[in-house]
From Swiss-Prot:
Gene3D superfamilies: Rhodopsin 7-helix transmembrane proteins (1.20.1070.10). One of its GO terms (cellular component) is external side of plasma membrane. SUPFAM superfamilies: Family A G protein-coupled receptor-like. It comes from Macaca mulatta. GO terms for biological process: calcium-mediated signaling; cell chemotaxis; immune response; positive regulation of cytosolic calcium ion concentration. Belongs to the G-protein coupled receptor 1 family. Keywords: Cell membrane, Disulfide bond, G-protein coupled receptor, Membrane, Receptor, Transducer, Transmembrane, Transmembrane helix. InterPro entries: CCR1-9-like (IPR050119), Chemokine_CCR8 (IPR004068), Chemokine_rcpt (IPR000355), GPCR_Rhodpsn (IPR000276), GPCR_Rhodpsn_7TM (IPR017452). The keyword Transmembrane helix applies. This is C-C chemokine receptor type 8.
Amino acid sequence: MDYTLDPSMTTMTDYYYPDSLSSPCDGELIQRNDKLLLAVFYCLLFVFSLLGNSLVILVLVVCKKLRNITDIYLLNLALSDLLFVFSFPFQTYYQLDQWVFGTVMCKVVSGFYYIGFYSSMFFITLMSVDRYLAVVHAVYAIKVRTIRMGTTTLSLLVWLTAIMATIPLLVFYQVASEDGVLQCYSFYNQQTLKWKIFTNFEMNILGLLIPFTIFMFCYIKILHQLKRCQNHNKTKAIRLVLIVVIASLLFWVPFNVVLFLTSLHSMHILDGCSISQQLNYATHVTEIISFTHCCVNPVIYAFVGEKFKKHLSEIFQKSCSHIFIYLGRQMPRESCEKSSSCQQHSFRSSSIDYIL
């Protein structure tokens, strides 16, 4: 959904209107006046997302050792967010200068963005289905919720689906010179306008409508089951995933709504100069909001995850003990024992596993 690289709509490059499809109305268009501020914004997002999601991966791999299928999904979700922000360093340079990385990297960077978006939404959807099975169909879940199922079958299927959904979006990406400035963007003319509308609806359907429908079904069933059974352990088991789902919807729904309205505008169902300018402005705002989601999940884990902060503390203590040993010092015995608990502590894996 990287409209950051679509010059006809976003903050990432100057406006360009192929043929007469999106010719500017009379009056001032929304232009990018503060490139430096936007570049700083991308840098901050990249740093915080890289740090936060790397810590999540470290906790899952080192402390929890990927003991259950939920850990596998959380690991893939963190990888999706990292893939999403891979484009930010390129976009930062793009803000300050021009696209100097060539056509291949134009498609590759855009591809990482789209794959990161799709895979993130798909894994959140998969986690919701997983919680549904664990709570509503606990006996059946014990049979199907295996590490092998999560790592080989479902995870690979999600990544493959995300890649396949991305390919049509990359066909029209190219590098061209506008007023002597190299730009990376998706180009549509009168003949290919239908593909722009198709890809917009594809993102609406695959990135929001289908996941949202599954979310609603799963959590209505889960809440009904919890209301009937009053199981405190099951309530704790779904809380974190539910918060992640709600946060993702809050960050992505506004952009998808604007994307849908933009498709209607391209089809001339919505028309007029005022609507065009309002959609351009709304795209700027909702795009920036959606970008921020890549930093949110680690923050949620830190505040909601019961064991996440504990695992981070154990990793930090263990690192400190190694530093002290390297420096020829000794830590107090109690600290050393606590630092080693990260590897010695065992977690019970069942159909209702605790998350971080």
